[in-house]
Structures are given as structure tokens and as C-alpha cells.
């Protein structure tokens, strides 16, 4: 088979099963409204949960830092790209979340891959929740360690897998809030089981940090859990982009030596780091608390309204509210029907989610108003008839 035939066959297979992904060009996409092709839509696909991407204080911090530092970092943090802005943000994150150290990464995907591939060796085992993010599972597959996956949030299955003999070390991998189902992991029980088997725990709290817990400290803090490795990302609750790994002093020193994504990547712009410090200040403030309260009220309003409809609603109390449709083509048609009525929603299909669980992945943000939720419910009920 030629290279071209391989490419063509893969695309043909995706088209045949209604799983071909596409990008949409938008002129505005992060806030309450999404604008595409000159039309304005209520935006129910953004992960800017607290609406901070449009916050004037954060925008101003980025602008001021860009004037001071320029628009790029100029190198890896090991060469010349570790600025005072990066150092300040790492120290603020570590203090906020109660860890000795924080290390910045350019993305959550890079952070997850860096940590897992740097730590895991040939005789080790990774035990990951079956619904873990693609970055975690891909990193596990790329590492020399054995990968075992436990049934989603099934702690008994997790325990059985950890009990089987392992020559090396074991790492349990889970998420705080799951990106496609919107539900939370039983973190306290998972941590208890991991410690009983002398395993380390890695929690990716991309969708919880900033949004849940005291001062927005996330799902782990809310549940009284302190994993050995906590990954937080900045594209959701923080409204910016990038990520950080929270860990011990020795693990941070180890990652600085062996995490290739950290060593061999140009670091995030200092202006971005300073904007993230400004975002953290908002998250920790009374204003941040008010934004979280408003978001929680909007989620409650949506769930109360949609329960009477014909859609399958998962047990999710986060900003992520998936409506399970099942059939791929039905999910696409439903998303298009909502767009025709001025509501922008995204159809999620395999391989992102398991076969037979295609869905509308609706995300609510603090930027929405109660009338927006009511309009979404009205359109959903009409589209579902």
C-alpha cells in the first residue's frame, strides 16, 4: 500500500462512519457569543468556564508584559527562556495548591506526556481509568511501562489490577473532572487504594482547577486529596493556555533533568505567564468566588430543565453537560439543528468517545445568563421532538 493509499483509506473510513472531524473558522469563539460566517450564536462549546479570557485585568497584564518582555520567551527554560514572570507564577501556584514545587509546560498534553514518559520504566505498570484523556493514554502507550485500564470510576477493578504482581513501580492515572462525561472521579477512595499498594497517583484536573474548591483550588483540594503528581491546565478555568505539574522538590528536580517536553521546548512567553498570574489573582478573589457561584447556578438551572426532556443526561455537575445521543449521524444532525436555531454546540463521536455514545458536549460558562440557558432548553426540546 502506498503512502497516498494509506491516507485516503483512513479518511474514507472516517467518512463512512460519520466520524470525520472538521474545523470551523470563527471570528469570535471564547465568550458568550460565537461569531462564524457573519452570524452570531450562543456559544455552548467554549471551555472558558469562568469567562476570564475576556477579563480586562488579565488582558492588560498580558499587554504590559509583552511591552516589557516581548511576545516570545526566546528559548527553553534551560537556556534563556525562564524569566522572572515564569518563576513568580510557579511559586504562586505551588503556594496556592500546597505543594513544594510547580513546573510550567506549554500545554496539558505536553505536561502529561512529559511526566509519564520521564518517570515510567520497562518493568513498571500504569493503571489508568478507561476514560482518561488521550494525552494520558497516549503517553502510557509510548512509555516502556505496561498499561492496564480500569473500568471508569470502578475502584474495585482498580484494586484488583494493582494487586497483580508487578516487578517495578505502579502509577495510578485519573482525572478530577472527566472531559467528555463531565463527572468526577472518587479521588479519596482512589488515593487510599493507590497508597495501600504503594503506588503513586497522578490526577489531571484540567476541568476542575479554578472552577471548584476553596478559592478555585480544584477537585483534589475539594476532596481532601493530595496526589504525588497534580497536573493543572490553564485553558479552561484560567481562560488562557498552558499547564503546570505540582509535585515534590525531588520530583521537580528529576523532571527538570529528564522531561524532554520541558527540556527541549521553547517555554511559554513571559507575557503569558504574567497574564496567568493575573488570572490566578482573579480566581482567588471574591470576584472569582462570585463567578464560580454563578456558573454553578447556571449548571443547576440547565439540569433541572433538561431532565424532563427525552435526552440521556449523565450524572455530571460540572460545566460539562453531555447529552448522549448514541448514533453518530444523529449527533451531527442535532448539532446542526441547534446551530440553525442560533445555539452553537459540538457533536462528539468515536474515537473520542466509545462507540454508541455519540453526544452533544454542551459546556456552560459564567459568561452565560439565565435567559441563555432557557433558550438552549427551548431549542433542545424542539430539536428532540
UniProtKB/Swiss-Prot annotation:
Protein name: 8-amino-7-oxononanoate synthase
Names of required cofactors: pyridoxal 5'-phosphate
Family designation: Belongs to the class-II pyridoxal-phosphate-dependent aminotransferase family. BioF subfamily.
Task of the protein: Catalyzes the decarboxylative condensation of pimeloyl-[acyl-carrier protein] and L-alanine to produce 8-amino-7-oxononanoate (AON), [acyl-carrier protein], and carbon dioxide.
Pfam families from the UniProt entry: Aminotran_1_2
Subunit-level organization: Homodimer.
Organism superkingdom: Bacteria
N6-(pyridoxal phosphate)lysine sites (modified residues): 236
The gene coding this protein: bioF
Catalytically driven reaction(s): 6-carboxyhexanoyl-[ACP] + L-alanine + H(+) = (8S)-8-amino-7-oxononanoate + holo-[ACP] + CO2
Amino acid at each position: 500500500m502506498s503512502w497516498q493509499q494509506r491516507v485516503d483509506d483512513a479518511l474514507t473510513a472516517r467518512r463512512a462512519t460519520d466520524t470525520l472531524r472538521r474545523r470551523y473558522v470563527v471570528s469570535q469563539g471564547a465568550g458568550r457569543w460565537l461569531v462564524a460566517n457573519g452570524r452570531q450564536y450562543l456559544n455552548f462549546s467554549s471551555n472558558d468556564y469562568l469567562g476570564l479570557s475576556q477579563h480586562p485585568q488579565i488582558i492588560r497584564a498580558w499587554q504590559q508584559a509583552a511591552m516589557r518582555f516581548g511576545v516570545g520567551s526566546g528559548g527553553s527554560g534551560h537556556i534563556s527562556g525562564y524569566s522572572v514572570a515564569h518563576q513568580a507564577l510557579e511559586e504562586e501556584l505551588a503556594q496556592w495548591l500546597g505543594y513544594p514545587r510547580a513546573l510550567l509546560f506549554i500545554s496539558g498534553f505536553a505536561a502529561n506526556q512529559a511526566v509519564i514518559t520521564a518517570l515510567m520504566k520497562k518493568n513498571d505498570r500504569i493503571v489508568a481509568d478507561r476514560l482518561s484523556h488521550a494525552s494520558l493514554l497516549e503517553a502510557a502507550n509510548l512509555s516502556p511501562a505496561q498499561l492496564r485500564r480500569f473500568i471508569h470510576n470502578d475502584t474495585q477493578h482498580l484494586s484488583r489490577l494493582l494487586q497483580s504482581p508487578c516487578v517495578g513501580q505502579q502509577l495510578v492515572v485519573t482525572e478530577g473532572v472527566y472531559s467528555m462525561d463531565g463527572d468526577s472521579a472518587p479521588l479519596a477512595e482512589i488515593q487510599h487504594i493507590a497508597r495501600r499498594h504503594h503506588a503513586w497517583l497522578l490526577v489531571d484536573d484540567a476541568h476542575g482547577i479554578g472552577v471548584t474548591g476553596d478559592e478555585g483550588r480544584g477537585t483534589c483540594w475539594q476532596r481532601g486529596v493530595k496526589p504525588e503528581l497534580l497536573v493543572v491546565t490553564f485553558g479552561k478555568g484560567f481562560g488562557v493556555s498552558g499547564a503546570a505539574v505540582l509535585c515534590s522538590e525531588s520530583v521537580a528536580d528529576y523532571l527538570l533533568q529528564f522531561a524532554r517536553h520541558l527540556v527541549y521546548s521553547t517555554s511559554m512567553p513571559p507575557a503569558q505567564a504574567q497574564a496567568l498570574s493575573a488570572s490566578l489573582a482573579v480566581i482567588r478573589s471574591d470576584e472569582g468566588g462570585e463567578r464560580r457561584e454563578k456558573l454553578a447556578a447556571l449548571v443547576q438551572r440547565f439540569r433541572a430543565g433538561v431532565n424532563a426532556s427525552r435526552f440521556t443526561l449523565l450524572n455530571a455537575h460540572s460545566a460539562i453537560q453531555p447529552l448522549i445521543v448514541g448514533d453518530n449521524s444523529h449527533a451531527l444532525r442535532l448539532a446542526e439543528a441547534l446551530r440553525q436555531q442560533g445555539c452553537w454546540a459540538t457533536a462528539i463521536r468515536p474515537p473520542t468517545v466509545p462507540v454508541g455514545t455519540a453526544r452533544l458536549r454542551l459546556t456552560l460558562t459564567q459568561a452565560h445568563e439565565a435567559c441563555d440557558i432557557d433558550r438552549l432548553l427551548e431549542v433542545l426540546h424542539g430539536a428532540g421532538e
